[in-house]
């Protein structure tokens, strides 16, 4: 618990400073530390009693041997050489006993860690491949969602009887209010979760009948929450294709409009990004994630608010690159900025876990439904911002 508290405090140090909550974090740490000290005090008290008892026994053993042995030597019932030999034997016995006592504390600490490790290792993944699962090969990119319902638990249904077919090479945008089920739908396609009912297939193969690895190899995902490893920019981009050459990495960086930023850094592609990319801006982290997808070059793309952290200028720059990347690939785009998806082949509106509308940008505007309302609201806000 204390280690989690320290990690949380250090990871959120900027947030704590921004809200002037240093005192709150200090109080949380003091509480966690007090709990840690209480548990450790009981442990060390028990170990202290144990070590003291062992030492008392071992020291008493020598005293008893010398006392009784000396008495018997004086009485002539024992030869002094026998007493000396016996004392040496006992001394050789005492040293291993001390080591065993010291080992017991190390063992107690290690055993607690081992129990936690075994508990994690014995946890079975909720999504598993079938014994006879096939490999997904030569993917064209047809996605079929057939009467899919999904709930994270029995009381929290997210999707209700959703059906959708995406043709190979088609670009489909998914919009709707927050919490409507857009991201959940896109997490079901790579089989991060199993559907509660219905089925999802890629190229007419149910994703439950193919290996998860082959699914993930053919799908590229850029999410809102970008995760970067504590490594260099080069290795973070190369994560999309571990055997990529430096030339391929540079090309991907250029397409993602991050190359100039990298070149401006003192160490270029060898720049260390810090834990979770803390040394980079939000836009830079997102563009590195986009560069990974350019490098991976999959037949299916899922862009979950992929440009949410980009400014308007940079977003406009990479929009053309996205159009080139999406050409000939099946692409699903989750977007709140509706201006970025006007050119999608189809736009689907999801609200409360149900598909409410489907059509092109112009068709949905003419319908005057949820999409039209969202579009008008965003336009009004944009005009208001310009007026100010």
Annotate the PLM regions.
Residues 129-130, 134-388:
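ABC-type nucleotide-binding domain
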Residues 18-21, 41-45, 49, 76, ...:
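Residue-level signature of the cytosolic catalytic core of signaling kinases
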Residues 42-115, 120-121:
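Helix-loop-helix
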Residues 16, 117, 251-253:
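Helix-loop junctions and hydrophobic alpha-helical segments within the transmembrane domains
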Residues 29, 117, 145-147:
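Conserved catalytic Walker-motif region of ABC-type ATPase nucleotide-binding domains
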Residues 1-8, 14-63, 106-109, 125-126, ...:
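An intracellular "coupling" helix at the cytosolic face of ABC transporter transmembrane type-1 domains
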Residues 4, 11, 15-18, 31, ...:
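Regular, well-ordered alpha-helical segments
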Residues 1, 8, 59, 99, ...:
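HisKA/DHp dimerization-phosphotransfer core of two-component histidine kinases
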């Amino acid at each position: 618990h204390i280690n989690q508290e320290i990690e949380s405090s250090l990871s959120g140090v900027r947030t704590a400073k921004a809200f002037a909550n240093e005192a709150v974090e200090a109080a949380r740490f003091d509480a966690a530390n007090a709990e840690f000290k209480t548990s450790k005090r009981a442990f060390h008290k028990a170990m202290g009693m144990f070590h003291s008892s062992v030492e008392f026994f071992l020291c008493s053993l020598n005293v008893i041997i010398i006392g009784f042995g000396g008495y018997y030597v004086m009485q002539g019932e024992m030869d002094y050489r026998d007493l000396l030999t016996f004392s040496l034997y006992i001394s050789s016995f005492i040293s291993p006993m001390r080591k065993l006592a010291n080992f017991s504390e190390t063992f107690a600490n290690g055993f607690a860690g081992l129990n936690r490790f075994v508990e994690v290792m014995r946890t079975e993944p909720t999504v598993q491949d079938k014994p006879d699962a096939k490999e997904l090969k030569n993917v064209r990119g047809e996605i079929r969602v057939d009467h899919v319902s999904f709930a994270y638990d029995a009381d929290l249904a997210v999707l209700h009887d959703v059906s959708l077919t995406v043709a190979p090479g088609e670009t489909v945008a998914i919009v709707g209010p927050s919490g409507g089920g857009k991201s959940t739908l896109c997490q079901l396609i790579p089989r991060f979760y199993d559907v509660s009912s219905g089925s999802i297939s890629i190229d007419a193969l149910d994703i439950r009948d193919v290996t998860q690895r082959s699914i993930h190899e053919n799908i590229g995902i850029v999410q809102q929450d970008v995760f970067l490893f504590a490594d260099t920019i080069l290795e973070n981009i190369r994560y999309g294709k571990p055997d990529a050459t430096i030339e391929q990495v540079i090309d991907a960086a250029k397409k993602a409009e991050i190359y100039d930023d990298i070149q401006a850094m003192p160490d270029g592609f060898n720049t260390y990004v810090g834990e979770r990319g803390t040394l980079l801006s939000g836009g830079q982290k997102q563009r590195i994630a986009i560069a990974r997808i350019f490098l991976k070059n999959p037949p299916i793309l899922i862009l979950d608010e992929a440009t949410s952290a980009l400014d308007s200028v940079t977003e406009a720059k990479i929009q053309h690159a996205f159009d080139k990347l999406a050409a000939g690939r099946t692409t699903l785009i989750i977007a709140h900025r509706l201006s970025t998806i006007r050119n999608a082949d189809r736009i689907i509106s999801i609200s409360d876990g149900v598909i409410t509308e489907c059509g092109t940008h112009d068709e949905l505007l003419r319908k005057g439904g949820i999409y039209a309302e969202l579009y008008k609201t965003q336009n009004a806000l944009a005009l208001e911002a310009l007026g100010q």
